[in-house]
């Protein structure tokens, strides 16, 4: 069945630290949900590799702290690598503006027209509106959802996810797919561990049941605890990818 979606791209251009908001570009997307997505994703991955651009697909449920984690992480690495961000949401440009104001890096907002994920073609359309010749690392903050984003290959070089303490340590058992495809699981909001029945050891155990190779990194995006480890992991991932 054809699935109609609208991907609206808010492009922010940066000149002398000023934001010039371009007019909204509206692109109609009409395709079957899974039609050729894996082929599209593989093709996009090869193109990005040829350009030397690493694409990180960051997933999580809503409210897990993706944007705050990105701000903390980007501010630790932006002097070492050229970074840009694509923010995917059903509506609003709040996160893209927040990223720009807090980090000063290029960011665009993708509106999915009600869809709960991005696929490879939608990701490509976002990348087409980015200054790719001036970027080494693009971080895609996918739509907040623990199910749909994991089902669609975006063409990323690497998948990451954030699990927050209030969500519970049993999420890897309930939502196995996302945990099984991620190279790293960031456990955010460890500053509130005393107030929740969250067992970090159980969380690690359950993550590794789904994905023995996944790295588990506890952090607090609010206090900054553990963010250095995630930033180091990301830089290592990019450098290792460049050598392959």
Explain the meaning of each model-derived region.
Residues 89, 188, 220:
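Active-site glycine-centered loops adjacent to acidic/histidine catalytic or metal-binding residues
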Residues 58, 110-111, 161-164, 186-189:
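Conserved beta-strand segments of the P-loop GTPase G domain that flank and frequently precede/overlap
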